[in-house]
Curated annotation (Swiss-Prot):
Residues 6-62 form the BPTI/Kunitz inhibitor domain. The gene is PapD. Keywords: Disulfide bond, Protease inhibitor, Serine protease inhibitor. The record marks 22-23 as: Reactive bond for trypsin. This is Male accessory gland serine protease inhibitor.
């Protein structure tokens, strides 16, 4: 991977126990299986470093 965060699991909303949070932050994450950046809505808690503010930022870091 170009950067370590790109190898982390595709970022999802919520905590590991499946509770989603109430924030609404349009975000991008690198999906290693699809080998592309994908959009998702981050709820504001949980997740990991595989979360970016734009498609361009995700692609610059991971592709």
């Amino acid at each position: 991977f170009k950067n370590p965060e790109c190898g982390e699991p595709h970022s999802l909303d919520g905590s590991p126990n499946g509770i989603s949070c109430r924030g609404y932050f349009p975000s991008w994450s690198y999906n290693p299986d699809a080998q592309q950046c994908v959009s998702f809505v981050y709820g504001g808690c949980g997740g990991n470093n595989n979360r970016f503010g734009s498609q361009n930022e995700c692609e610059e870091r991971c592709i």
